[in-house]
């Protein structure tokens, strides 16, 4: 005899009050990930995924749009307060933080977590334009 089909349960959205926004700003792209305190991702967005291609991905405006998209998606979880971790030397660092502030989040702290080598790998050669 066949088993009765299990009813698909509705996935319950958990509510999170405090979160962390990780902004990875490289020279070519900007990635914004919003997580809870344990590091579980709630939402994310990138400049490339926001419709920008090529050299337009690495602009401050593209980082702003990506941060707005990630911020709006994380509002569904009831997020209010954010700590911001900024990593990398890219042009979208400040504009992404400003966009998250404009989404209505209360930003408690902004931390620069850019990894700095203790004379590790050899850097790329200088550009000759």
Swiss-Prot record:
One of its GO terms (biological process) is translation. The keyword RNA-binding applies. Gene3D superfamilies: Ribosomal protein S11 (3.30.420.80). It comes from the Bacteria. GO terms for molecular function: rRNA binding; structural constituent of ribosome. GO terms for cellular component: ribonucleoprotein complex; ribosome. Keywords: Ribonucleoprotein, Ribosomal protein, RNA-binding, rRNA-binding. InterPro entries: Ribosomal_uS11, Ribosomal_uS11_bac-type, Ribosomal_uS11_CS, Ribosomal_uS11_sf. Belongs to the universal ribosomal protein uS11 family. Part of the 30S ribosomal subunit. Interacts with proteins S7 and S18. Binds to IF-3. Located on the platform of the 30S subunit, it bridges several disparate RNA helices of the 16S rRNA. Forms part of the Shine-Dalgarno cleft in the 70S ribosome. NCBIfam families: PRK05309.1, uS11_bact. This is Small ribosomal subunit protein uS11. It comes from Pseudomonas paraeruginosa (strain DSM 24068 / PA7) (Pseudomonas aeruginosa (strain PA7)). The lineage of its organism: Bacteria, Pseudomonadati, Pseudomonadota, Gammaproteobacteria, Pseudomonadales. The gene is rpsK.
């Amino acid at each position: 005899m066949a088993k009765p089909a299990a009813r698909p349960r509705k996935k319950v959205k958990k509510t999170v009050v405090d979160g962390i926004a990780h902004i990875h700003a490289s020279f070519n792209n900007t990635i914004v990930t919003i997580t809870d305190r344990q590091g579980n991702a709630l939402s994310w967005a990138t400049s490339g995924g926001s419709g920008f291609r090529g050299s337009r991905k690495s602009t401050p405006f593209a980082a702003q749009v990506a941060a707005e998209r990630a911020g709006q998606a994380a509002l569904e979880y009831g997020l209010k307060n954010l700590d911001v971790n900024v990593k990398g030397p890219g042009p979208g660092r400040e504009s992404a933080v400003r966009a998250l502030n404009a989404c209505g989040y209360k930003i408690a702290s902004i931390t620069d977590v850019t990894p700095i080598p203790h004379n590790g790998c050899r850097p790329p050669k200088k550009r000759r334009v």
